[in-house]
Amino acid sequence: MTLAKEIARDLLKIKAVYLKPEEPFTWASGIKSPIYTDNRVTLAYPETRTLIEDGFVEKIQAEFPDVEVIAGTATAGIPHGAIIADKMNLPFAYIRSKPKDHGAGNQIEGRVAPGQKMVVIEDLISTGGSVLDAIAAAKREGADVIGAAAIFTYELPKAEKNFNEAGVKLVTLSNYTELITLAEAEGYVSPEGLALLEKFKHDQENWQA
């Protein structure tokens, strides 16, 4: 079994992912979605956590061999990033969503030298906006961001467009296609539910029509 499939199976099993194509969730953006993901839950399950962190290390070593520092997005990317940095014996930093309004006013916490090659860790990619904002902040402070890595992506066309426009390489451990295919095969959703889930991937506005 591939890593992407193993992680998809674990996310379903521990209920980090909920699929409700017939009774959709409403995301903060207002989008009606048949899927809801809370990857923070993975931290409570040592086997899943180890699978994820080892997967990150393997992907980063393969895709970004020159990495010199790992950074996590606040807050979801912090625990994963810290574990990855420890496993890889690399420095760790984290990137706030905005600079502190007191003290030194830092947006990056930790020590990042100018030109240091950074990989930014996020737990979930929907449109990619938050991690790309974090990457822009890291670049402003002198980091050489060579890529981003996340546990899971919804594979939304908007995310692909955003990463391409920003010139940022993204790698993920698992993805929406792997997960919904496995979910139907293992009885989490019906064939009709799978059809709705597939429609959502291609058209987030009109998938229920």
Curated annotation (Swiss-Prot):
Ordered alphabetically, the record's keywords are: Glycosyltransferase, Magnesium, Pyrimidine biosynthesis, Transferase
- A biological process term (GO) from this entry: pyrimidine nucleobase biosynthetic process
Q: Which cofactor does it need?
A: Mg(2+)
Give the catalysed reaction(s), semicolon-separated: orotidine 5'-phosphate + diphosphate = orotate + 5-phospho-alpha-D-ribose 1-diphosphate
GO molecular function annotation: magnesium ion binding; orotate phosphoribosyltransferase activity
**Broadest EC class assigned to this enzyme:** transferase
Q: Out of the domains of life, which is the source?
A: Bacteria
Q: Where does orotate bind?
A: 126
- Which family does the record claim for this protein? Belongs to the purine/pyrimidine phosphoribosyltransferase family. PyrE subfamily.
Tell me the PANTHER family matching this sequence: OROTATE PHOSPHORIBOSYLTRANSFERASE, URIDINE 5'-MONOPHOSPHATE SYNTHASE
Quaternary assembly: Homodimer.
Q: Identify this protein by name.
A: Orotate phosphoribosyltransferase
